[in-house]
Amino acid sequence: DFASRWLIPRLPDFLALHDDIEISFATRLKPFDLSREHFDLAIHFGTENWPDAEMELFCSETMIAVASPEFREQHTINEISDLLKVPLLHMESRPKVWQDFFEQAGLSSEDALAGKYFDQFSMVIAGAVASLGAALIPTYLIEREISEGRLVTLAASTITTKNNYFLVRPTETYSDHVALFVQWMKNNVGR
């Protein structure tokens, strides 16, 4: 989801400035030997646990409560406690994030684990757009849906998860091209 919803939509800007740089993408679910598999850079979500590599914090994951405008109209949501009364959409890899969100607001959250569960954020986003429920989604994944009005925020409060995004490089020296790409990513993280 990070690559398809944040990185790739911004990539034409980088390639317009650096058309001599070739970029390829591959998905891995676990840390691997970057040098042996000929990777210059990896983007890792999780904790700082990649052996034999140089890890640099890229950004944290901040999530915001959203739903479709129709869902918000159908359910009276004026404050965070109102979200305890509506269907909630969950991401399987972050099963307790709603519970943490409510507890952060000082609310009891026994019902926060109920609702529909999905294994990809793209499905959670589609479910929220389809008015299946309220969702906690990383802000960077829903920039387009928010700007187009297909999703609206339900509370000013956000929650930052315990995991982060890291830029991971082999421990040996990396090329100027990788350095340019890393700097470009850092410059674009807040945009």
Language model features by range: what are they?
Residues 32, 36-38, 48-132, 137, ...:
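C-terminal regulatory
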